[in-house]
Amino acid sequence: MELSIIYDKLRFEEKELHEKAVNKGISTHLIDAKPISFSTDISQSNSIKGDIFLQRCISHFRGLYITSCLEYLNHRVINKYDVNEICGNKLRTSLILAKSKIPSPKTYFTFSAESFKELTNKLGFPLVLKPLVGSWGRGVFPIRNEETVNIIMEMREENDSALSRIYYVQE
């Protein structure tokens, strides 16, 4: 078996995974994700080697789409594209947790600034607004009053990202 560990920043964890696999006699490669390229022409994209790929990219979208390309080429990837897509999207994750009756904060989704404002008026404060995609607390806003709601609405309306029109709010 040949294991390829794909990363975009070589951290302690990737080095340890590599070392432990080598110590167990597994042929292992560390592959930097940044210079990788793929093609829809399968014959052009087989330069990447491995029987199984452990996708360890910090960048959600880089890892997600590298996984998609590897699966297109019929490679086995841990974790699969569908798993990465769900886990990287708070709305999708929240829906699955709720459907599976796994306790989590009360969560609401709106799809316009106006409905976001109506929701905050109905629920009251404090609330928390989170981006659909992201980690490490980036883009998380505590909402304690209507002034904060108005500032967030203005910021989001100036942003060209389609995801900024979706408001993910938790009590």
Regions found by a protein language model. Give the residues of each.
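A conserved helix-loop-beta module that forms one wall/lid of the active-site cleft
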Residues: 26-31, 70-139
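ATP-binding N-terminal substructure of ATP-dependent carboxylate-amine bond-forming enzymes
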Residues: 1-83
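Short amphipathic alpha-helical segments and helix-helix/interface helices
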Residues: 14-18, 67-68, 94, 116-117, ...
